[in-house]
Structure formats: C-alpha cells, structure tokens
Swiss-Prot record:
Expressed by the venom duct. It comes from Gemmula kieneri. GO terms for molecular function: toxin activity. This is Turripeptide Gkn9.1. Transmembrane segments: none annotated.
C-alpha cells in the first residue's frame, strides 16, 4: 500500500514538473517570436524613411540621413534608392 502511494506521488510530481517545463518553453517561444518580429520590422523598414524625413534635406539632417540606404543625393539632397 505504501509503495503504491509513493509511486502515485512521484507520478504526480513528475507530471507537474513536465507542465512547468512546457509552460516555460511556450513563454520562451513567444518571446523569441516577438523579438524576431521586431527585428524583421526594423530591417524591412530601414529603406523607408520616416514621414518627417520625406521633405527634408538629408545632407542637413543626420537623423534622416541614417535612413538613406542608397546614400544622400548631393544634387537634390534627398535619399537615393
């Protein structure tokens, strides 16, 4: 009787540990997906300057110049694609 009770307690303990590990892996997977989504958005948005940079001269504004992937046109002063 005592052995049966010990086996039952150990099985419950192992199952609860397994559920805890599954919960951590799901949370880790969600965090990884969120991080990769943010990085993907940053990478794909790199070539598109923000709205406030579209009418500015990128030679004069260093913050807008960083968004120019093709460089800044010395003649027009806008981003080259």
């Amino acid at each position: 009787m005592m052995a049966k009770l010990m086996i039952t307690v150990m099985m419950v303990l192992l199952l609860s540990l397994q559920q805890g590990a599954d919960g951590r892996s799901k949370r880790w997977r969600k965090n990884q997906m969120a991080a990769s989504s943010i990085m993907r958005n940053l990478i794909t948005a790199r070539g598109v300057p923000p709205r406030f940079c579209r009418d500015k001269n990128c030679n004069e504004d260093s913050e807008c110049n960083q968004w120019c992937t093709g460089g800044c046109s010395s003649v027009k002063g806008n981003c080259e694609s």
